[in-house]
């Protein structure tokens, strides 16, 4: 029984390490996925990409996703957007 509990806890820790929070990446343009006030669209897109909750961050006009894989998130250091939409 202790082994089963240990395996479950270990799995949860590994899953937590491989996920992150951030702005969704539009892989075609390299930009953030933009939005205005549509939380439903951002939430759906976030869940499709493996996250558990997404919303439209109004001040940045971009979809913010919690729990998605890092490869699905926009990163400032690897930004390839250059203003193209």
Swiss-Prot record:
Signal peptide extent: 1-19
Family annotation (InterPro entries): LCN-type_CS_alpha_beta_dom, Scorpion_toxin-like, Scorpion_toxin-like_sf, Scorpion_toxinL, Scorpion_toxinL/defensin
Gene Ontology annotations of biological process type: defense response
Record-annotated LCN-type CS-alpha/beta domain positions: 20-82
Domain of life: Eukaryota
GO molecular function terms listed in the Swiss-Prot or TrEMBL record: sodium channel inhibitor activity; toxin activity
A Pfam family of this chain: Toxin_3
Family to which this protein belongs: Belongs to the long (4 C-C) scorpion toxin superfamily. Sodium channel inhibitor family.
Domain observations: Has the structural arrangement of an alpha-helix connected to antiparallel beta-sheets by disulfide bonds (CS-alpha/beta).
Function: Beta toxins bind voltage-independently at site-4 of sodium channels (Nav) and shift the voltage of activation toward more negative potentials thereby affecting sodium channel activation and promoting spontaneous and repetitive firing. It binds to distinct receptor sites of mammal and insect voltage-gated sodium channels. It displays antinociceptive effect in rat models, which is due to its specific modulation of sodium channels of sensory neurons.
Protein name: Beta-toxin BmKAS
């Amino acid at each position: 029984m202790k082994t089963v509990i240990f395996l479950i806890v270990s799995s949860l820790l590994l899953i937590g390490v491989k996920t992150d929070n951030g702005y969704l990446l539009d892989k075609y343009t390299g930009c953030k996925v933009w939005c205005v006030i549509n939380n439903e669209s951002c939430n759906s897109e976030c869940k499709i990409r493996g996250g558990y909750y997404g919303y439209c961050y109004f001040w940045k006009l971009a979809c913010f996703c919690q729990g998605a894989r890092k490869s699905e998130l926009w990163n400032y250091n690897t930004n390839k957007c250059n203003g193209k939409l």
